[in-house]
């Protein structure tokens, strides 16, 4: 029992609504404690409706805008949402929309990954392609390759941790320095955005290195998978 919210999705904004249903069913059929539960779904001629629990605490983006989280809290929340992401990958899916807005905090103070609207199934080679991208969080391979792998999600999760550790102002101040879209794209491709050498003073160097591994511009130099990401985070001490 409890409050629920209804998410209303325009079918016209989904390239293939049948494919959307099939991938959603594959994900929702196997629940995970760190994924937002879907209570039920239905549709009419124009919309898809999805019912899910109401999260009164809101998203990690909301929480970090109101207070500073400790290193321990950020690592704990990160391991939790990454556990949900690992489950998604194990089902042959890529999320494609990892960001602080899409990590909700439950009443039990646990992180749940949400919003599977861009999630796509991988082909037999482990590739998939998103229908859209979030312009503030873009992996460099977007500009050089049509085939995306789970490393797309690993980069996005690294960028998410970078934002959680340094704060939204630190992140957005870097964004405002670009004079053109070409400057922004070039900074992503060359690894100059976000600034991997610019962390708040209290962030442990070991944690900085782990996050920067996820943010490597070369996918083969990122974490091989989410479990490797989680294992490294679990070894970080606060001081």
Where are the model-predicted features located?
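ATP-binding glycine-rich loop module of kinase domains
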Residues: 1-15
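AlphaC helix of the eukaryotic protein kinase fold
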Residues: 14-29
